[in-house]
Amino acid sequence: MQNSKKIIPVLILIGLICLPIVQFFGNYNYVIHMVLFCFLYITMSSSWNIIGGYGGFISIGHNVFFGIGAYFSGFIYARYGISPFYTAVFAGLIATVFGFGVGLITLRVKGPSFIISSIALLMIFRTLFDRWELVGGAHGITLPHNNLSVEWSKIPHYYALLVLMVLSIFLSWYVRHSKFGLALRSISHDEIKSEVTGINIKIIKVTAYAISAYMIGAAGAIWGDYLTYVRPNIFFIILIAANMVLMCILGGK
């Protein structure tokens, strides 16, 4: 039984790696698109689960980092021609740094107050990027198409998001089984008792918030390139964060 639990994920991963082979037998772009879409949300929900599931802080504005990653890589690509496949790592880092700063401010409150503050953050960024002419304002940034044929144009993004999905699942698993994750879950149950035991609750919460932002930012970079445009009304909408929350609620922590 234990061996089967280890083998099944490996078999699924092998199947996902081999899936694009179907393109040799016809145009299965829609299938590839839907699987790729699943990769995106698994990546983001696994990352959100670190702060929302383990930490107990329900962030309804977490796709701010999705937009930051998309805009960072999109701007670099449009201005300097450096592909988001190279800058996604740095997009994640930018999102992490920003997440740390935001966490220092918003994580001072909890419960409904934190939820409201996360929604307010999303609204602020939607308004900011709607009016920021440097990045195209409400029209956003249009990115170049790749030179691959229609049948194969999605495949680079497919594998990029597959890698991010695997890494985000592993990161979530690793956090859960680490001392850091134990402290984080302790805080979610009772902050006062956790602090009494010597846990630095401020650092733990802010670090968890920043870690959860990384993969979401990197995913935003790849998704922006996949769409070939980055706009506020696509990346800074509450529906994206709501989907992350629902996936974690329905799928479990």
Where do the model's predicted regions map?
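Single transmembrane alpha-helix segments in multi-pass membrane proteins
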Residues: 27-79, 105-114, 187-196, 200, ...
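Hydrophobic positions within alpha-helical transmembrane segments of bacterial inner-membrane proteins
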Residues: 46, 50, 88, 92, ...
